[in-house]
Amino acid sequence: MAKESSFDIVSKVEFPEVQNAIQMTLKEIGTRYDFKGSKSDVTLEKEELVLISDDEFKLNQLKDVLSGKLIKRDVPTKNIEYGKIENASGGTVRQRAKLVQGIDKDNAKKINAVIKNSGLKVKSQIQDDQVRVTGKNKDDLQQIIAAVRGADLPIDVQFINFR
Protein backbone atom coordinates (compact mmCIF):
# COMPACT_ATOMS: atom_id res chain seq x y z
CA MET A 1 0.00 0.00 0.00
CA ALA A 2 1.33 3.42 -0.93
CA LYS A 3 1.97 5.97 1.77
CA GLU A 4 -0.53 8.81 1.87
CA SER A 5 0.63 12.38 1.42
CA SER A 6 -1.03 15.37 3.05
CA PHE A 7 -0.94 19.11 3.56
CA ASP A 8 -2.78 21.65 5.69
CA ILE A 9 -4.67 24.71 4.50
CA VAL A 10 -4.40 27.55 7.04
CA SER A 11 -5.04 31.27 7.22
CA LYS A 12 -2.43 33.18 9.22
CA VAL A 13 -1.27 36.75 9.67
CA GLU A 14 2.35 37.30 10.69
CA PHE A 15 2.21 39.90 13.48
CA PRO A 16 5.88 40.98 13.27
CA GLU A 17 5.27 41.84 9.61
CA VAL A 18 2.12 43.78 10.58
CA GLN A 19 4.16 45.71 13.16
CA ASN A 20 6.81 46.49 10.51
CA ALA A 21 4.11 47.70 8.11
CA ILE A 22 2.66 49.94 10.85
CA GLN A 23 6.09 51.46 11.54
CA MET A 24 6.64 52.11 7.82
CA THR A 25 3.17 53.69 7.57
CA LEU A 26 3.82 55.99 10.53
CA LYS A 27 7.16 56.99 9.00
CA GLU A 28 5.51 57.81 5.67
CA ILE A 29 2.62 59.84 7.13
CA GLY A 30 5.14 61.77 9.21
CA THR A 31 6.85 62.99 6.04
CA ARG A 32 3.83 63.48 3.75
CA TYR A 33 2.69 67.04 3.15
CA ASP A 34 -1.04 66.23 3.30
CA PHE A 35 -0.60 64.75 6.80
CA LYS A 36 1.38 67.72 8.23
CA GLY A 37 -0.14 68.81 11.55
CA SER A 38 -2.74 66.03 11.60
CA LYS A 39 -3.35 63.62 14.45
CA SER A 40 -3.06 60.41 12.43
CA ASP A 41 -1.95 57.19 14.10
CA VAL A 42 -2.04 53.41 13.63
CA THR A 43 -1.64 51.01 16.56
CA LEU A 44 -1.84 47.26 17.03
CA GLU A 45 -3.85 46.12 20.06
CA LYS A 46 -3.79 42.31 20.44
CA GLU A 47 -5.31 41.10 17.14
CA GLU A 48 -6.82 44.42 16.13
CA LEU A 49 -5.57 47.49 14.26
CA VAL A 50 -6.75 50.91 15.44
CA LEU A 51 -6.59 53.75 12.90
CA ILE A 52 -7.09 57.33 14.12
CA SER A 53 -7.12 60.50 12.01
CA ASP A 54 -8.60 64.01 11.81
CA ASP A 55 -11.44 63.20 9.42
CA GLU A 56 -12.82 60.41 7.22
CA PHE A 57 -10.87 61.53 4.16
CA LYS A 58 -7.52 61.37 5.96
CA LEU A 59 -8.56 58.09 7.59
CA ASN A 60 -9.18 56.58 4.15
CA GLN A 61 -5.80 57.89 2.95
CA LEU A 62 -4.20 56.36 6.04
CA LYS A 63 -5.93 53.06 5.24
CA ASP A 64 -4.59 53.18 1.66
CA VAL A 65 -1.02 53.82 2.86
CA LEU A 66 -1.31 50.99 5.41
CA SER A 67 -2.71 48.58 2.80
CA GLY A 68 0.19 49.33 0.47
CA LYS A 69 2.73 48.70 3.22
CA LEU A 70 0.97 45.46 4.26
CA ILE A 71 1.02 44.21 0.67
CA LYS A 72 4.76 44.99 0.40
CA ARG A 73 5.33 42.94 3.59
CA ASP A 74 3.27 39.99 2.18
CA VAL A 75 0.51 40.37 4.76
CA PRO A 76 -2.84 39.30 3.23
CA THR A 77 -5.22 42.26 3.17
CA LYS A 78 -8.17 39.90 2.65
CA ASN A 79 -7.78 38.89 6.31
CA ILE A 80 -8.53 42.40 7.59
CA GLU A 81 -12.13 43.16 8.53
CA TYR A 82 -12.66 46.91 8.94
CA GLY A 83 -15.29 48.06 11.41
CA LYS A 84 -17.38 51.19 11.09
CA ILE A 85 -15.89 54.66 11.48
CA GLU A 86 -16.67 56.19 14.87
CA ASN A 87 -15.99 59.55 16.50
CA ALA A 88 -13.08 59.66 18.93
CA SER A 89 -11.88 62.26 21.42
CA GLY A 90 -10.44 65.59 20.30
CA GLY A 91 -12.53 65.82 17.12
CA THR A 92 -10.85 62.81 15.52
CA VAL A 93 -12.32 59.67 13.97
CA ARG A 94 -11.35 56.09 14.74
CA GLN A 95 -11.73 52.82 12.90
CA ARG A 96 -10.94 49.37 14.23
CA ALA A 97 -9.82 46.57 11.95
CA LYS A 98 -9.80 42.95 13.09
CA LEU A 99 -7.01 40.68 11.84
CA VAL A 100 -8.63 37.34 11.03
CA GLN A 101 -6.62 34.29 12.11
CA GLY A 102 -7.62 30.74 11.22
CA ILE A 103 -10.35 29.36 9.00
CA ASP A 104 -13.88 29.54 10.41
CA LYS A 105 -16.50 26.82 9.76
CA ASP A 106 -18.18 28.61 6.83
CA ASN A 107 -14.93 29.17 4.95
CA ALA A 108 -13.78 25.62 5.75
CA LYS A 109 -17.00 24.33 4.17
CA LYS A 110 -16.35 26.48 1.08
CA ILE A 111 -12.83 25.04 0.83
CA ASN A 112 -14.23 21.50 1.22
CA ALA A 113 -16.75 22.22 -1.57
CA VAL A 114 -13.92 23.36 -3.88
CA ILE A 115 -12.01 20.16 -3.08
CA LYS A 116 -15.03 17.90 -3.63
CA ASN A 117 -15.95 19.66 -6.91
CA SER A 118 -12.46 18.98 -8.26
CA GLY A 119 -13.36 15.28 -8.60
CA LEU A 120 -9.92 14.10 -7.48
CA LYS A 121 -9.39 11.17 -5.11
CA VAL A 122 -8.46 13.08 -1.97
CA LYS A 123 -9.96 13.36 1.49
CA SER A 124 -10.36 16.60 3.40
CA GLN A 125 -11.21 17.13 7.02
CA ILE A 126 -11.78 20.24 9.09
CA GLN A 127 -9.47 20.40 12.12
CA ASP A 128 -10.17 23.39 14.39
CA ASP A 129 -9.00 26.40 12.34
CA GLN A 130 -7.39 24.51 9.45
CA VAL A 131 -8.29 22.00 6.75
CA ARG A 132 -6.17 18.87 6.21
CA VAL A 133 -6.13 17.30 2.77
CA THR A 134 -4.80 13.75 2.28
CA GLY A 135 -4.37 11.65 -0.84
CA LYS A 136 -2.20 8.92 -2.29
CA ASN A 137 -1.05 10.90 -5.32
CA LYS A 138 1.05 14.05 -4.80
CA ASP A 139 -0.01 15.34 -8.23
CA ASP A 140 -3.65 15.31 -7.06
CA LEU A 141 -2.66 17.31 -3.99
CA GLN A 142 -0.88 19.87 -6.17
CA GLN A 143 -4.01 20.15 -8.33
CA ILE A 144 -6.05 20.75 -5.17
CA ILE A 145 -3.65 23.54 -4.16
CA ALA A 146 -4.12 25.13 -7.60
CA ALA A 147 -7.93 24.78 -7.34
CA VAL A 148 -8.07 26.35 -3.87
CA ARG A 149 -5.76 29.21 -4.96
CA GLY A 150 -8.01 29.80 -7.97
CA ALA A 151 -11.21 29.78 -5.90
CA ASP A 152 -12.71 33.12 -4.88
CA LEU A 153 -12.48 32.82 -1.10
CA PRO A 154 -13.16 35.70 1.33
CA ILE A 155 -9.91 34.95 3.20
CA ASP A 156 -6.32 34.42 2.12
CA VAL A 157 -5.02 30.86 2.62
CA GLN A 158 -1.56 29.34 2.94
CA PHE A 159 -0.47 25.73 2.45
CA ILE A 160 1.81 24.16 5.05
CA ASN A 161 3.15 20.73 6.11
CA PHE A 162 3.24 19.25 2.60
CA ARG A 163 4.29 15.65 3.23
Curated annotation (Swiss-Prot):
Record bears the keyword Transcription regulation: no
Domain of life, per lineage: Bacteria
Coiled coil: none
Keyword Nucleotide-binding: yes
CDD domains for the chain: YajQ_like
GO CC entries: cytosol
Keywords annotated in UniProt: Nucleotide-binding
GO MF annotation terms: nucleotide binding
Function noted in UniProt: Nucleotide-binding protein.
Family: Belongs to the YajQ family.
Protein name: Nucleotide-binding protein RBAM_011030
Organism taxonomic ancestry: Bacteria, Bacillati, Bacillota, Bacilli, Bacillales
